[in-house]
Amino acid sequence: MNAFASGHAAHPDWRMALSMAAAQVDSQLAPQAPPTLGFVYFSDHYAAQAEALLAALRQRWPGVAWVGSVGLGVLASGVEYFDEPALVLLLAGLPREQFRVFSGARPLSGFDAFSALVHADPATPDLGELLVELSQRTASGYLFGGLAASRNGMQHVADGVWQGALSGVAFTQDVAMVSRVTQGCQPVGPVRRITAAEQNRVQRLDGEPALRCLLRDLDVTLKEPRTLLPRLRSTLVGLSEETEAMLGRGAMFGTDTRVRHLVGVDPAQEVVAVAEQVRVGMRLAFCRRDAQAARRDLVRICS
């Protein structure tokens, strides 16, 4: 078989979608190399049938370990399904000793994890701390994955269907992978150093009130609320540690930059609040989502 076999389909009946996607997968599988690990992502139109879907996957491919998640939309090669009943499958023939599926009911203890694919319920209390703890259990500290998204239950799959907490699959260092990051953002002003901050409140940038810097970058004033509010809603914040390079080629964000939401401003104190705890010394640049920036990132990643 190829390194991976994939399939995808959309249909009001999850059984029909699974049948169509499975036919695509089976056409790529070689009988001498059966799959051992499967990934399933399904839109929330199938959320109520998640248990039945997993049972059907197990019946079709006995012995395969399954991980995955629900989402408002799912993607495959060259196609996206958003807010419609659809699913995506990916199967791999990895040696079983090179991975382990984990969940709250099946912890990672005793496994020599190097990296991990993680799915999580976004409503989980202290999720950030749980991810840090899991990262510390891997040799590389590298986690990738995402949050479940649904209007009908935040299911994630790890040899069972779970809600709450997190689950996924860990890999040994024998599983080689290439990882690239795209933020899809364009800075709208210079990189500045945080010189005064408290929790998630940025008070001063390069010694100047943070809100004053933001308004200058957006070319707007507090006296123009009709112009100001839409621009604030579309503005994000790029953050990096003092020792990390924030900008890469073409004045774009580097791979170590974390993009967070702007969650509020305090005109009286000229303070900006962001969706992350910040510290003096960190680097900050205001930014916005940008289609051309995303395209450039993808070209860079695929080059």
Task: Give residue spans per PLM region.
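Active-site-flanking structural segment that lines cofactor/substrate pockets
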Residues: 53
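Small-residue-enriched flexible segments
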Residues: 1-47, 56-58, 64-65, 69-303
